[in-house]
Amino acid sequence: MRRLAVIASLAWALGGCATVAPPPQAAIPVPLADAWTLQGRLGVQTERESLSGQIRWQHGGGVDQVLLTSPLGQGVARIVRDPEGVSLELPGQPVRRATDVDTLTRDALGYELPVAGLAWWIQARPDPLREAAVALGDDGRPARIVQDGWTIDYLQYGADARPRKLVVSRAGLEIRLVADSWQSAP
């Protein structure tokens, strides 16, 4: 009997030392380097038209270069944003320049492409310099960000915890982005 009491006491004492695994935490997207490249597919739906194609976005050193191509790989538009402003190249047209992307794309395309905000949103983060509302999903990752009149819905995350599918929308415009690959530049 005494032996049973010693074993029970020992088990109780050791049980108090047992560690409990912490609850699982949401997968936090791996921060990208200051320079990165995103390749994927893009769909744009406006009240007048529906477009689809591919996107190659290089970001780094205060410069964004966005190349939009048709599903067959032909260049449709090239947007370059740097500290001096932004330029837009469309086939068969002179290069257009402006101080900001919103104005330039609105004038040239008839709708704004939020390149400055997208640089943050595609990383599942709001622009830290602007007010935003962030709704988290059950997994603790952003499910929706609302910022600057845009709503960003995160439909799927990749194995690396980075957004894979997202929808960016505002009245009369919906942009669907599927990130096929991310690369951090050296």
Swiss-Prot record:
Membrane topology: Lipid-anchor
Lipidation feature positions (N-palmitoyl cysteine): C17
Family of this protein: Belongs to the LolB family.
GO biological process: lipoprotein localization to outer membrane; protein transport
Signal sequence annotation: 1-16
Role of this protein: Plays a critical role in the incorporation of lipoproteins in the outer membrane after they are released by the LolA protein.
Annotated Gene Ontology cellular component terms: cell outer membrane
HAMAP family, A to Z: LolB (MF_00233)
Intracellular or extracellular location(s): Cell outer membrane
Record-linked CDD domains: LolB (cd16326)
Pfam families for the chain: LolB
Lipidation positions, renumbered (S-diacylglycerol cysteine): C17
Alphabetic keyword roster: Cell outer membrane, Chaperone, Lipoprotein, Membrane, Palmitate, Protein transport, Signal, Transport
Domain of life: Bacteria
Quaternary data: Monomer.
Protein name (Swiss-Prot/TrEMBL): Outer-membrane lipoprotein LolB
